[in-house]
Amino acid sequence: MLLILGHMVNDMFSNLLSGLLPIFTVLFDLSYVLAGLVAMVFSVTSSLLQPLLGRWFDRTQTTWLLEGGLALNCFGMSLVGISPNYVVLLFLVGTAGIGTAAFHPPAFSTVARSSSASRGGSMGVFLSGGNAGFFLGPIVAGLLVSAFGLQGTLLLLPIGMLTALLLLRVRVSERPEPSLTKSTQPPNRRLLGLLATITALRSITIQVGVTFLPLYLVAKGESLLVATGVASIWLGVGVLGQIAGGHLSDRIGRRPVIVFSLFVGAAIFYGFLMTTGLISIILLALSGGVLFASWSVIVTMASEAAPDNVGAVSGLMLGFSIGVGGLAALGFGGTADMLGLQTAFYIFGAFAIGGGMLSLFLPKDTGDVGSVMVVK
């Protein structure tokens, strides 16, 4: 439970930026490209370091990465509200990115190694904590700014630091002995490469949604509070999809869930873009539930493909997810500057469909470790 709480708080801080970006865009007179660069700095700093820190954790079991990473993420994001200029904003966002890069590998590794009977379900529950944090991030940002102005982000600093202190207990209560979890199974590099590519394509669609949905809704005439609230609904239903996808993959297999999630989720998201009013909000929520259902399944499948390198593999998957998504945010911003936000969403939604096409080449399985591992 402490890991789920820590994941929720960590990812809440990570997604504060989504709710604050419309304000910084006005405050610093940013184009969509420069707004996308803010998201990209966070994404690139975390994605470049995450696989390296994951590999280091697999070899050394360095315990302080978990709570230290959360504390650094919290520190950087809590201070963004008092950024005097754009350069300082980029520096603080980059600092937070380093923190989340340190947090995730030991957290993923602990979950994967401590749950063997139903990896998909356990990973889904753990990842739902992160999605819950993503859901809360824009809402918390909107409420704080409405009540206290941008400097209200400082009020979150004690929450993050207290949670980091609580994670010290994970050292003795939830972290397994690595010597008891070793396997002789070599990593399935071909499968890992395919999963990383699917992750990258999927993340392009999702990251531009996380970053630009509030801006899109504000451009449509909604207030910042309504825009961040509606965007959070997308992420909130994604929490349920994350849990459902993980448990369903334990029953019917990993590949069917991933294929359905990417094809159907993208189709529903296009429906959101084509409609207005209540129907549009319902379709947006449904697309979140379906699109996010694939993430826990992909991470589980990757950890099964390399059981002795879960930290490195989870870092690779999340690094691809955050890094490519961040680069996509910059590209999306440029496209939106030229063609408009709605046209840019139409273009970038197609990447999830590309991920769905590649997922057809994943091995057939029944959700157990062996069926994944024997595929060459």
Language-model features: where?
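A late C-terminal transmembrane helix in Major Facilitator Superfamily
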Residues: 307-338
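Extracytoplasmic gate region of multi-pass secondary transporters
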Residues: 17-18, 190-239
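C-terminal transmembrane helical hairpin of 12-TM major facilitator-type secondary transporters
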Residues: 252-298
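Helix-loop-helix hairpin linking two adjacent transmembrane segments in secondary transporters
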Residues: 126-172
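Cytoplasmic helix-loop-helix junction between adjacent transmembrane helices
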Residues: 92-129
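Helix-to-loop junctions at the C-terminal end of transmembrane segments
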Residues: 49-61, 241-253, 336-337
